[in-house]
Design a protein with these regions (language model features):
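Polybasic, positively charged surfaces/segments
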Residues: 1-189
Length: 189
């Protein structure tokens, strides 16, 4: 796997190309899911960046009054802050320098599921929702590296006093953490 800084670099270049609708090559691969594919080149690397259902996510960002330029600025202008890696799921998290957004790696299965519910999700989500706000699904493919990402709102973007953090999964199986743990689980809740 590539170093975090390299992954972040390719993610930023792909985001800039797809969000600004530029790139060496763009085509809609699937008319139902609307996958925009960009063949990009950076130094000696040739790689693909996929943006899933661009127009639907544009509508979601517009619903939450997210200006495209400020979105790109948050994600691309400065280095992201590397977060935690969750060993069980293998997910890696970053947050933007301004704390507005979280970037999370997702599995192929999670990507497929999110894409399958995207139409219903976008029709259901409202301005005052308690659902996580997903603003984009992306994929980087580079020789032997393949990773998928979602970008979502950071619910902790403002300084607040948090007494407990829970990792809730909606099940009780293996879902108890020692009270001294940093993250508590479903049974602790």
């Amino acid at each position: 796997m590539y170093h975090d800084n390299t992954t972040e670099h390719f993610l930023k270049l792909g985001l800039q190309s797809s969000l600004k609708n530029i790139g060496i090559y763009r085509k809609i691969v699937d008319k139902i899911q609307h996958i925009d594919t960009y063949n990009l080149k950076c130094n000696d690397y040739e790689w693909k960046f996929k943006c899933y259902n661009r127009t639907r996510f544009e509508k979601i960002r517009n619903l939450f009054r997210i200006d495209l330029n400020s979105y790109i600025q948050s994600l691309c202008d400065q280095n992201m802050i590397t977060g935690k890696i969750y060993p069980k799921s293998g997910s890696k998290f970053w947050r933007t320098y301004d704390n507005k957004y979280i970037v999370k790696t997702i599995t192929k299965k999670e990507c497929k599921f999110l894409r399958s519910i995207l139409k219903r999700y976008s029709n259901h989500i409202k301005d005052n929702t308690y659902l996580v706000k997903i603003f984009g699904i992306y994929r980087i493919t580079l020789s032997n590296f393949d990773s998928r990402f979602i970008i979502m709102n950071n619910i902790f973007q403002y300084e607040i006093n948090i007494e407990n953090i829970f990792d809730l999964k909606g099940t009780t199986e293996e879902r108890y953490a020692n009270e001294q743990s940093i993250e508590l689980k479903d049974i602790n809740f």
